Structures are given as structure tokens and as C-alpha cells.
């Protein structure tokens, strides 16, 4: 396995080009890996980031099979980027997913996938040659309201998540219900019978991520 390369070796060099008169710093492209410096501000309540803190590290897998280690990282659901804190200040370095296959954080795998003509961040739970089971993340900006009954004096970022199945490259949003899962998978009557027997014998619940992974693993084996 190739050694992990520390991105911060060239992050430090790129930081030398900081423009103190602007909130956005100059972009760069290093070995096909692009990013931009910017000064993060929070003009609204809530956050566009997936994680509550910046304590996690990430292993970035490029399409060309190179790997990079990024420290103090978070995932920006609004910009569809992964961002790294350079110091304890609010300054961050923002990376696009261009040329990136996946990002691993705390043994979780994230991919940027096109859905409904826009890029969206997905956590991949299961994958084989035909099927992927994932959770998709999205953030929406809810405008402030002057109505005192609404109790929303400021704009607010609200994060949502949904489950998805990809079957033969067709990505579908689903609810964790057996009928909907079976329909999305396009199962034959024979496969449905086998899966029903498997569910009954193992007492798994299709409302749990880990049990759906077990079901799909079994389906791939028959």
C-alpha cells in the first residue's frame, strides 16, 4: 500500500499567498488536486458542515489511486467540499471533489455523486457490482421570519438526510420499508422468497442500516 502523503506539506506553502484584504484567498491546483482558501464566516444560525467539530482526520482517495491525509477536516454540505482548518482561527482550506474517488473519515466512507442534476454528498454503507446503499445529506437555508409565532428571527441552516439505493447505476431515494426496497432492487419472485426467509430466520429489521447491509450482503451471495 502506498504511503499516505501529508497534504499539509503543500497547504503550508499555499498559505504563504494569503491576501489579508480579502475574505477569499487565491486558489491553487497541485498535482490535479484543487482548492481555495477562504475566511469562514457564519452570518446565519446553524452550520453547513456535517460534523459538529474539526477533530476528525480524513484519508482522501484520488481517482488515480493516490492517497492523502488531511487533518482537522469537515464536510461542507452547501459547497460540496471537504474543508480543513489550518489553525485554531476561523481560516479554512476548501477542497473540491474534483479528481477524488472517496473520502474516509472515522471509518466512514463519503462520496460526491450527481443526483437530480446536482452534486450531493453521500455516505456509502454497502456496495457491490450492481448495488449501493447510501445516506444522502443536504443543507437548506431557511429564511428568517418576522412572525413572533414562528420564532425564527435569523436565517437558519437546516440539515436533512435521506436513504438511497443505487441499482445498476440508477439512484433512487427510498424509505426503509421492505416493499419499497424490494421494488427498487427489481427482485424476482424467487429472490423475494429467499429474502423473506432470510429476514424471518435472522430476525433482522429493515429499519436499521446494519440489517439492510446484512440483507444486501446475503442477496449478493445467492
Descriptions of predicted regions:
Residues 28-31, 166-169, 184:
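Short hydrophobic/aromatic-rich motifs at helix boundaries and adjacent loops
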